[in-house]
Amino acid sequence: MVRVVATGTFDIIHPGHIRFLEEAKKLGDELIVIVAREKNVRHKPKPIIPEEQRVRVVSALKPVDKAILGDEHDIFKPIMELKPDIIALGYDQHFDEKKLEEELRKRGLNTRVVRIKAKEECEYCSSTKIIKRIVDVVKSRLQEYEEFFRSRGML
């Protein structure tokens, strides 16, 4: 059985995430997803959605056999425990495939690192674009939203 591991923040799930996970699943028999801990997200703003909720949503996705939270202190710890045959990286993930493979070999793992080049093309295939869209809509309709939330005792 070929075990594939994919990692990511998965803050606001969108079609790009789904495509990445579908492509990762095609690489093997079992797909385990490591969801980044909030404190370990450094290459972009902190996630909006709490980590426990992100892992729950990811675990419910069709291509995913299991989703777990990453380790707070050592990003390699869950990988060492899972011993994957393949690590799937998204087209835009900030890892160098060769350096990652070298690091895994130093740790005794013979894991292949595969860059998924497939990319879903859609207007909101980015959590950042979705957040920007929400901010823009809220700004343009601020009074309407304030009245809505006040009428429900939420402000």
Curated annotation (Swiss-Prot):
Swiss-Prot/TrEMBL GO biological process terms: FAD biosynthetic process; FMN metabolic process
Positions contributing to ATP binding: T9, F10, H14, P15, G16, H17, D92
Pathway connected to this protein: Cofactor biosynthesis; FAD biosynthesis; FAD from FMN: step 1/1
Gene: ribL
Class of this enzyme: transferase
Keyword set, alphabetical order: ATP-binding, FAD, Flavoprotein, FMN, Nucleotide-binding, Nucleotidyltransferase, Transferase
Job of this protein: Catalyzes the transfer of the AMP portion of ATP to flavin mononucleotide (FMN) to produce flavin adenine dinucleotide (FAD) coenzyme.
Needed co-factor(s): a divalent metal cation
Reaction(s) the record says it catalyses: FMN + ATP + H(+) = FAD + diphosphate
Subunit relationships: Homodimer.
The EC number(s) this enzyme carries: 2.7.7.2
Keyword set includes Flavoprotein: yes
Name the record gives this protein: FAD synthase
Family: Belongs to the archaeal FAD synthase family.
